[in-house]
Curated annotation (Swiss-Prot):
Residues 58-84, 139-170 are extracellular. Keywords: Cell membrane, Glycoprotein, Membrane, Transmembrane, Transmembrane helix. This is CASP-like protein 2U2. Its main location: membrane. Belongs to the Casparian strip membrane proteins (CASP) family. The chain crosses the membrane at residues 37-57, 85-105, 118-138, 171-191. Residues 1-36, 106-117, 192-204 are cytoplasmic.
Length: 204
């Protein structure tokens, strides 16, 4: 004979201390739904920020006449760092979108889509690798933006943001969004690590 609380079964005569909390299946269900909802929101935000980085970089062009007959043009591909960021942001954008779809399906069905250990490890590793690669690329682009803004006296590089203010402003916005995307990917990586831990312990 026992006492039923939700879906939990607590035998009569068992010792439960006043501070104890019995976790029911309903509470576990709510926790899973919340985590899957957060996972979807974070991944869709990562997709949106990476897409914004791509759009800003591709459309960031400014042409300036500095003297009669002398026209200069500033583009993202004038240096290597933004080019690398564009390529990596494109990869991360596609990956984040696919993972967001998988996460949404998992949330709707209350069941992990593609739920096996190999894919859990693959998701964990890809999240980790892309997070660090995006962080490195964003940092390199931030350095390029700083040099464009301030110059570098040691190697006699002059600041170029005087005649290209709009270009530099958009460039700075791109760097900012890149780091926000890194944060979103880092949170996604933490969630996938948690899923992998639960998988290794035999949980759903």
């Amino acid at each position: 004979m026992g006492v039923l609380g939700g879906d939990a079964h607590v035998p009569i005569g068992s010792q439960v201390s006043p501070g104890s909390v019995v976790v029911t299946n309903n509470e576990s269900f709510g926790h899973r739904k919340l985590l899957k909802g957060v996972d979807f929101l974070v991944r869709i935000k990562a997709f949106a920020f990476c897409l914004a980085v791509i759009v800003l970089l591709k459309n960031n062009v400014q042409t300036t006449v500095i003297a009669p007959g002398i026209v200069l043009q500033a583009k993202y591909n004038n240096t290597k760092a933004p080019v690398s960021l564009l390529v990596l942001a494109s990869i991360c954008c596609g990956y984040a979108f696919l993972q967001a779809v998988v996460s949404l399906l998992s949330f709707i069905r209350d069941k992990r889509v593609l739920n096996n250990t190999v894919l859990a490890w693959l998701t964990f590793l890809l999240d980790q690798v892309l997070t660090y690669l995006l962080l490195g690329s964003a940092a390199a682009t931030a350095e390029a933006a700083y040099i464009a803004k301030r110059g570098e006296d040691k190697v006699q590089w002059k600041a170029v943001c005087g005649p290209f203010k709009r270009f530099c402003d958009h460039f700075a916005a791109t760097v900012f969004l890149s780091f926000i995307a890194v944060i979103a990917f880092a949170v996604s990586a933490a969630i996938s690590a948690y899923y992998l831990f639960r998988k290794s312990k035999g949980f759903k």
